[in-house]
Amino acid sequence: MKNNKILQEQIIEPKLSDRQKKVLKSIIDEYTITATPVSSKLLVQKEFQDQSSATIRNEMMLLEKFGFIEKQHISGGRVPSLKGYDFYNKNLINKNNDVSDNFKMRLHKILSKRYSNIDEILNAAVSIINETTQLPAVVTKSSSEELLKRIDLVKINDNSALVLIVTSSENILTHSIKLDKNTNFNDLQTCFSVLDERLVDTKLSLISSKLDLIVDIVRAKIEEAEYYFSKIVHRVFDFYAHKPTVNSKTYGVKYLTKHSEFEDQQKLNDLLNLLEDSTIWQQIALNKKTDGLAKIMLGNEIGHEHLAIATAQINLPNTNRQITVVGPTRMDYAKIKALLDFLKIEVEKILGSSNEH
């Protein structure tokens, strides 16, 4: 019965007039700036001087009836609903919204510097995003999608060693190994040396499936090849094949205090829980849909009411990163989307053509 009702609502979804769209956009734009419910009187004063207050009030009543705006008990004005924000982001957002010259200059300055890897570049770029949006941002990446560039085995002591994996984005991944009486360190080092020779530029997630071919080569060098591969080597690389590792780092949490929504402790806790929710960042990092620009997801899509995220995926040779701005549903979506789109385009253009990661 509930599904039938939803289907009926979808079928009779009203088609908004141009004036109703303009009223809805004006309400959202005004509420984004002031965080105060918007009245018909205010709209007439600011945007609709050629219309009567009764006309605008009637349009607002229809928008409320259709579910695009709603009344808050603390005021006679109206605020956007999730449905209203969704319609705005799909149909009314200013797609030609430009970023400031200051932002462009600061980003290009970062991209012109010599950093050791892509993560250092994006860390610096995200700090500008934080400052400009006054919101926190999360950078995510999946190590399993990176390529192997080098692998070394370092002996720590008689009982332990460390596998060092250098990836295509110049990150270093480490795995501890216990050395027992059956382990000859030199033989084990031979195993990893052959991997270093044969599997450079292979995705970490695919190495495990290629080890059976490599063991035949190692067998010609050491007698216990099967033992070392089954007990040690496979354990290192099965990790990337069966459990993709997603790393996320949050920047700019301090800016939360600048938003009135988070004076409500429950809403603040909800956002902090979202930032710590590894599940959603894993879904974002492992999302294979790399086409297009920044995507916006509202609270009902991410399981956190009153919150929203805007995500851009940075695609570079052999690696990618996701930058996600997190905040209340009362975000400046046009501005945030423009910033993320510009960041994505410039980083991919400059780093994609000049670096091999």
Curated annotation (Swiss-Prot):
It comes from the Bacteria. Negative regulator of class I heat shock genes (grpE-dnaK-dnaJ and groELS operons). Prevents heat-shock induction of these operons. Coiled coil: none annotated. Belongs to the HrcA family. InterPro entries: GAF-like_dom_sf, HrcA, HrcA_C, WH-like_DNA-bd_sf, WH_DNA-bd_sf, WHTH_HrcA_DNA-bd, WHTH_transcript_rep_HrcA_IDD. GO terms for biological process: negative regulation of DNA-templated transcription. Gene3D superfamilies: 3.30.450.40, Heat-inducible transcription repressor hrca homolog, domain 3, Winged helix-like DNA-binding domain superfamily/Winged helix DNA-binding domain. This is Heat-inducible transcription repressor HrcA. Keywords: Repressor, Stress response, Transcription, Transcription regulation. The gene is hrcA. One of its GO terms (molecular function) is DNA binding. It holds the Pfam family HrcA. The lineage of its organism: Bacteria, Bacillati, Mycoplasmatota, Mycoplasmoidales, Mycoplasmoidaceae.
